[in-house]
UniProtKB/Swiss-Prot annotation:
Protein's gene: rpsH
Organism: Nitrosococcus oceani (strain ATCC 19707 / BCRC 17464 / JCM 30415 / NCIMB 11848 / C-107)
GO biological process: translation
A Gene Ontology molecular function term of the record: rRNA binding
Superkingdom, natural source: Bacteria
Quaternary structure and partners: Part of the 30S ribosomal subunit. Contacts proteins S5 and S12.
Function recorded in the entry: One of the primary rRNA binding proteins, it binds directly to 16S rRNA central domain where it helps coordinate assembly of the platform of the 30S subunit.
Protein name: Small ribosomal subunit protein uS8
Amino acid sequence: MSMTDPISDMLTRVRNGQNAGKVEVSMPSSKLKVSIARVLKEEGYIEDCKVIADAKPTLVIRLKYYGGKPVIEDIHRASRPGLRMYKSRDKLPRIRGGLGIAIVSTSRGVMTDKTARSIGEGGEVLCYVA
């Protein structure tokens, strides 16, 4: 049976891994998942991410903790298969007054809401991270 929402699966694996105190989580890889993981790494929410190229590529994410607590307090899906959420640059959400990020898929690639706003791009809001 195929997975209907691989991005939700990725976010759930990260959330469950941090709640369980895991060092790293692994999942099937895709270009979009790697792009999301790259943004999370650039913003300091995860330690590292790498793709293990086998017959089925696997994405491995090293989780980050500060003082024994997960760095990611909240991570959840915004746009989903049943209800896509597209926003123009003016309508991109500010998460926790700018302390969190929204990950946006634009025509120029996957980036944070702040980056998309600064280059004047809108797009599909994939998820929120705080």
